[in-house]
Amino acid sequence: MAEKDNMKVNTSPVADVETGTAEDVEAIMKKYDRESNTRVWEGVPKQVIRYLLAAFSLLMLYMNLFANWDERVRRSLFVGVVIILSFLIYPMKKGSTKKNSIPIYDIILMVLGAGAYFYFVINFKTIIGHATRISQTEVIVGVIGILILAETCRRVVGIPILCVATFFICYAFYNGLGQGREFAVVLKSVVYNLFYTTGGVIGTPIGVCSTYIALFILFGAFLEATGISEFFIQLANSLAGASTGGPAKVAVISSALCGMVSGSSVGNTVTTGSVTIPLMKKTGYEGEFAGAVEAASSTGGQIMPPIMGAAAFLMAEMVGVQYGEIAMRAIFPALLYFTGIFITVHLEAKRLGLKGIPKDELPKFGPLFVRQGYLLIPLVALVAMVMMGYTMSRAAIIATALAILVSMPNKETRMNPTRFINALEAGGKNTLSVAVACGVAGIIAGVVTMTGLGQLLISAIVGVAGDRVIVALFLTMLTCIVLGMGVPTTANYIIMATTCAPILVNGMGINKIAANMFVFYFGIVADITPPVALAAYAGSAIAKSNPMKTALIASRLAIAAFIIPYIFAFNPAMLFIDTGVLGVVTIIVTSLVGLFGVAAGLEGYMFANLNVIERLLSIVGGLCLIIPGTVTDIVGIVLVGISAALQMMQKKKAAAA
């Protein structure tokens, strides 16, 4: 039995490639993914926790389908349950190994924290009846609720976002006291706004999380239970496995597809990387490059429609458009991102002279699609429903039901009671970290609104940047990346959308969707940007490579993510805004050629090895082509054309010799 437990997990088409053991994967997740550091429950207690998480998922379904409650009641109940489950699952310190143990202080904190939010639920009508004139008891309850949510955040999400929230709360007190008000008055005002109104903890972020995000996380859990990730990997193998440097291309395709379902760049890097990274190394790629390809591709899963990262749902709410519109406008930038990585891995394979996987070791596309293509039905149906104008909640619930139905033909994935509970459990657990991050981010957004800090930031940035839009964009990018080094994507987006996005829109005149997409992108790429590049470090751990070098290569592979947001900020035609068919076609063609030029220049190879001058011509020409404009397009074509011509001449000379 022990031998079976330690067996190598191998879903690769190459039989002799050793992938990581389940223990290896778990160890890496615990190191780089805070959500994986949980208490050790066994036996009956483990089953109790399991069913509580499943019940939480059912509660979310009930609240969205049947409950006709006041929004503040629903959100407070949601946060209270999240606190209970978080304390049951996450210990005070990382690496806790005690089994079936929860300290008495954790029980006290859990009861106090959840009790604060349940107190508001029970006394809701009384509290809103006297508006801002909350009692001393209600102030104490609010303080407890905020403080214990902060401790929950430290355990589940991490310290960086907690530090940011603490700074903003301190600013709220500084602002109030600076106006000459007494501390007690300021305290009551801060607690009322941040705890009892929809301008704080139970604000828009938690509202979106308890509806759209939670339901889509649940949909992802059920979709994963159908075996769709394995299908995606096999599909990628059938499409690209035999081509030049096939395993790296398989990693790009499979990670893009699987990333839509997982929603976690670190989690996706570890799960798909345990298969793709060893295969890339066996083919001939360096460990650093293999880990970087997986990390960059997995991180991009959050920008890939139709199921983007949780922040995309918040973006739709904050911009005031349907999620379907956000997903539609994100299609081209996402395709460019993955095309850039795809081109780079192809050029690296050509430079190294790498081959693909033998065709007889790969699944055939036709038979594979006939056998398992039905697994795509829930995704296709989801896209169709969103385009047809279904509400996001309704579309997610129907798509989840379809995921259950499509699991039935295969006895290995058939949704029996055990698998059904497992999917509910996974959905409930995966919701916790997003919910906690949304609650704390709501505090930050609340302080910005309550104090007028947003207007001060606009004045400050405009004062520094003047009318130079590029300076404002650059400062915003740096802020996003620095915050993203320790703050989850969802919380990062909320912070940036309430602070920096208004600067770009109101101070610089940038399109609202483009500005929000800008901060969304840079919040995501923080996962592969040194020095705190968690997805890249996770890929490095699997590849057994140098972490910093892996992170630097991942940043180079994802160069499109650092360029594209600037382009659609200046010219939203890339997002299909204010443009016609000709404009869209032009920007697609020029951007693709431009990406090829940039990738070739950075890689140092086009049709042969590039010298310094050829690399500069390729990079500058590529950037000119990506930047919208007739003059820049002409300059770009000339420069990339010269570099390509020099390469062709060099290749002919080498062939003649």
Predicted regions and their residues:
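Membrane-interfacial loop-to-helix junctions in multi-pass transporters
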Residues: Q136-I140, G199-Y212, S238-V252, T283-F289, ...
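Membrane-interface helix termini and inter-helical loops of multi-pass transporters
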Residues: A67-W69, F124-T132, K188, Y192, ...
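Hydrophobic transmembrane alpha-helices that form the pore/transport pathway of multi-pass ion
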Residues: I233-G301, I307, A311-L314, G320, ...
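Conserved, well-structured core domains of diverse proteins
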Residues: M1-G129, V139-V143
